[in-house]
């Protein structure tokens, strides 16, 4: 008599869970307009957390520390003192 011992194995490997594998969505922070670029009133100039760059002439600051232009003009990123930076918008004078 022929005795057959058949064993069946899983054809898919069991997958364990992991504690990794997720990340928060990026916030797209940083400069939105370049130095020397013409900007319009209301344009967002710089998105930031905290005041990495401070508002200068004709630049406002939003509730989330976003810098925006108050008037039409040319954007300038300037150094103030040793370690402070600010963004200013200077209106263009038409002659």
UniProtKB/Swiss-Prot annotation:
Keywords: Ribonucleoprotein, Ribosomal protein. It comes from the Bacteria. The lineage of its organism: Bacteria, Bacillati, Bacillota, Clostridia, Lachnospirales. Belongs to the bacterial ribosomal protein bL27 family. GO terms for cellular component: cytosolic large ribosomal subunit. This is Large ribosomal subunit protein bL27. Pfam families: Ribosomal_L27. The N-terminus is cleaved by ribosomal processing cysteine protease Prp. Residues 1-9 form a propeptide. GO terms for biological process: translation. GO terms for molecular function: structural constituent of ribosome. NCBIfam families: L27.
């Amino acid at each position: 008599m022929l005795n057959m011992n058949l064993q069946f194995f899983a054809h898919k490997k069991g997958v364990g869970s992991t504690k990794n594998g997720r990340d928060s969505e990026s916030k797209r922070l940083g400069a939105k307009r370049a130095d020397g670029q013409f900007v319009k009133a209301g344009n967002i100039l710089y998105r930031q957390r905290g005041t990495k760059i401070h508002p200068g002439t004709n630049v406002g600051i939003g509730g989330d520390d976003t810098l925006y232009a108050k008037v039409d003009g040319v954007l300038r990123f300037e150094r103030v003192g040793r370690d402070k930076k600010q963004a200013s918008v200077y209106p263009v004078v038409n002659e």
